[in-house]
Amino acid sequence: MMENARILYVDLTKRSTMVKELDKEIYRKYPGGSALGMYIMLKEMDAEVDPLSPENMLIFSVSPLAGFPISGQSRMNVTAKSPLTGTAGDSQVGGYIAPHVKGNGYDAIVFTGKSEKPVYLYIDGDQAEIRDAAKMWGKVTGEAEDLIFEDLGHNKIESSIIGPAGENLVKYANIMHQRSRANGRNGLGAVMGSKNLKALAVKKTPTRKPADRELFKTLTINVKERMAANETIVSTTQDGSGGCVEGHAAEGFLPSYNWDKGLMDGWENTAGYTLTEKYLINRETCFGCAIRCKRVVDVPGKAEPKYGGPEYETMSTFGSYCGNTDLSDICHANQLCNMYGMDTISCGATIAWAMDAFEKGILTTEDTDGMVLKFGSGEHFEELIKKIANRQTGIGALLAEGSARAAEKIGKGAEDLVVANKKQEWPAHMVQFKPNLAVNYAVNNFGADHQSSEHDPALMAPKDDQNWIWPNQLAEFEDCDRYGVLDDNKAKFAFVTQKFYSMMDTLGLCQFAWGPAWQLYGPDDLVTFCKASIDWDTSIDELQEIGERRLVMMRMFNAKIGFTRKDDNMPKKAFLPITDTAGNVDQITEEEFEAALDSYYRYAGWDIKTGVPKKATLDRLGLAWI
């Protein structure tokens, strides 16, 4: 059953720690993830704080379900006000740290203030110690972790670490875990750096035992059979998310040349199967997960196994976005971003923007420190990434701000080349071919994100598809062609599946195992998991409401800062026509987009003019206190 949440508060200014408990009845409404993070921020922090000031909170939180050995769960969330978007910031990471945060007795760790000098926090049960990090400061993530092992005298920890990008307040700095996993997007690594906090290290703990072992076993005993019967899972295990390169290229919606085209010549050289054939040496997994989607590559002189390997978004942003077909350069860029602690989507997309601006004469060699930045090559990736991470005067400092702010500074039409929402660069899924994502990208509370709603192809599957595991929840939608216009059906699909994804983010679940379509587990399994693990009697309706509550809390946080419908917009390139491989010209019109936005707001119970949740919606979700 749900217990009180234990929250560790760490005041870095005063170098003090204390534990508070949150009543279990309140915790049930905000059970982990950024639902809990947003509850704390809305209750205890002024939304108008500078994201890089000591007043901004940095909250690490886990789900009450964390630490049980089942596929696709035990993800850790980080919440703060984002320096990239200026909105509520949110990020999840897999790997192994969440179970040990929970195993040490904490549901959340809240950092406030700013340390006078670099420090890290070490947790071993009830002992939470702020330790000196002078030796680690300035080091890349792998070296810093080794120095933490040395400082503690053992390596029985899991850690979250920033690299030089976080220390230098790069707007899209990541918080890295196990050198190859990231709390990415939103620049939360810069928030950590602004506090002079180099790392969070937690002592490893035993695996939790479920409340009902026999019931729990019904979910795990046949996992291999479930996987073998699911083509999507088999493909994910084989080639990782990199398999999306060939899937998108086959139909002509692989974002290329900074989103001017839907296909890159030579894309086969960057495909998932090419990575598997040329460079893959291992597949890694997260806590308790059988899917093993993580790539581990070895590229002599360019990429070491300890920094993992690229997944689809990285393979696209440093590949087709830049017109680059050299997979070894992509692997090298991925390693450098992991070492320096930077988001590969924003970094690659910002470099692609710079190439676009250079080719159009907006940037010159005087702006780029002499580099000729043209589509078709990754030769300058290393120099650019290092300059960005270190905020080196010139092109490094400019691109460290992200493409939107860089364009604002440059002017001369550079803004028209930016592909971002709320200043966060787009992931590699084209809205001309997945129109529902146009709505999701626009309304998403922390900028464009491809993992905040289901994608349009789910609407093409017959409802009797054996891999369709959420039939009762998705049967209300009309089957439609993913290349169709953006209409009311797509807007409804965006809202309903956004609630599911929000629920998953709250409970620390991974979309590859628990997503709304073609995945390993379904809604009945989730309810069973809650019961079997912690004796939580719940329903899919309660869990969906938790997901919606999280969305609305984020929306209200943003509203307090002044974000409205005007900020739920599309970049100019989103409205460009794209010709697919079948010869169809696909395009979203501004009229279709605005009408779909109206529909979304109606389904969500938000005011159509302002985009702010209505009082009735707040009351229904128990959020009148906001």
Question: How should these model regions be labeled?
Answer:
Residues 149, 156-160, 164-186, 190-626:
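Extended C-terminal regions of large enzymes
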Residues 1-189, 194-213, 217-238, 242-264, ...:
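Protein-protein interaction/assembly regions in multi-subunit complexes
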